[in-house]
């Protein structure tokens, strides 16, 4: 992402306020981009109040010597079959709250590395990184439960830059097979070709970064996976927007967007949807920093949806 673009600090401030919880690991600020600096009041931008949730937590040192937080909701402690959710990018409270709202058999691990999807992609480009992450999560969960833990399925969630980790993980065929579901929260991006040349000026999308998501979407359409993508109307300028990348998926997969007008979680306003098999795209209004954070705050509802597909 070029450094000559002026950073907009609004999303950074809001992310810190919206995702920080008690005794939580520091969250990397978003990389500089260009959401609209406009102040608007047409959407509520509701925020889930941070509070203590029942259940044990453990922390271990993971990729890039960053702390990984593991939370086992109180209702999960006695579950026989466990389901793992690995969340990339964003404070731990929202993912913890999200899994606590599901059936009492989910465990969540939260990974935060640094601003920008490239850091997440490079870190997990070595398949051993994800293998190690899963092994450590299993170890910590087993220690928490005082018994050997095994996971019936794995769901990966990426907010914003966190999609870079999922992209890298899914490139490995064994990991592609291991992952059962993916949830992308306003975080499917790629570069322009040539770099910094928007589509209006003749640029195209770097399709290489999207190929594995096309493959996962095809598997979801066949009913083999579950895949939900949400996006805003933010136009970063220096790299492709989530609207452009989801349009690409729609085109390549031969699908069609349907216009809708309905309320979403946290006061969000949904404008479009795509549904085929177990693959869905939901498009929402908004091109400012708070609209981006809305998608993270709505993780409980979106995670519930992808898990019930």
List PLM regions with ranges.
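Active-site machinery of serine-nucleophile hydrolases
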Residues: 79-143, 268-271
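The feature captures the conserved acid-bearing segment of alpha/beta-hydrolase catalytic domains
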Residues: 183-290
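Alpha/beta-hydrolase fold nucleophile elbow
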Residues: 147-160
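Bacterial N-terminal signal peptides that target proteins for export
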Residues: 1-8
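N-terminal signal peptide c-region/cleavage motif recognized by signal peptidases
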Residues: 18-20
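Conserved hydrolase catalytic core segment
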Residues: 169-179
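Glycine-rich nucleophile elbow surrounding the catalytic serine of serine-hydrolase chemistry
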Residues: 158-168
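A domain-start/cap signature at the N-terminus of enzymes
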Residues: 24-82, 267-269
